[in-house]
Amino acid sequence: MDTGTRITTILKDAGARDVLDIGCGHGALARLLVREGLAVTAIDPAPDAIAAAQETVPDAQFTVAGAEALPFDPGSFDACVFLNSLHHVPVPLMAQALHEALRVLRPGGEVIVVEPLAEGPFFEVMRPVEDETEIRRAAMAAIDALCSAGVATGPAPQTWSRPTPVANTEAFIDTLARVDPARRAVAEAQRERLADLFARHATEGPNGPELCQPLRLWRLRPI
């Protein structure tokens, strides 16, 4: 089951209708949720990402905003989703971002957080371009602290490995640059090293070479 299917299954099983996509990027998750019949509001601090998302998903509502200061009233949403976005929030603001997501939930709502672990083939090949070890660990520590403080609770997190088809080093660089265009220049400077790491870590999947990335999903409800 892919990540998007996991999220939509959770939302639909919970009877969610109004969903906030926090850190939406170019709108990939928003597009999927709209197709599934959900009412989607999405935020991202990058105006260019929001502009691209609005063009791609005209049936969702998009706002330029940071996760640490959501411009919504309490009780506005049935669910909030951080899909690979919490670790992009500045570390000192991660806890506030989680509190904000809990604040805007309706009674019975939940916050879904999906984060990549600081391990695995995809991560190892990416490290010369951007080593996210510390920020990924900080995101998980923020979630753990929230639960330890008795602010939120939820079932044990789910962990799985996501395969990403990447035909070659060039395709891998393209994949990284789609998330952050600034990565391309760094990746090009590290092309020889990336090619070596790609050869060491890529495995053959049903559609050609792929790199796997372990992911973890939390479901958090306010206490």
Report the location of each language-model feature.
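Class I SAM-dependent methyltransferase SAM/SAH-binding core
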Residues: 20, 25-69
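Conserved Class I S-adenosyl-L-methionine
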Residues: 150-223
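A short glycine-rich, Lys/Arg-flanked "PGG" loop and its adjoining helix->strand segment in the class I
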Residues: 95-107
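A conserved beta-strand element that flanks and buttresses the S-adenosyl-L-methionine
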Residues: 81
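Short alpha-helix
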Residues: 136-150
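Short catalytic micro-motifs in class I SAM-dependent methyltransferases
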Residues: 84-85
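Conserved alpha-helix/loop element of class I SAM-dependent methyltransferases that forms part
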Residues: 1-17
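Conserved class I S-adenosyl-L-methionine
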Residues: 112-137
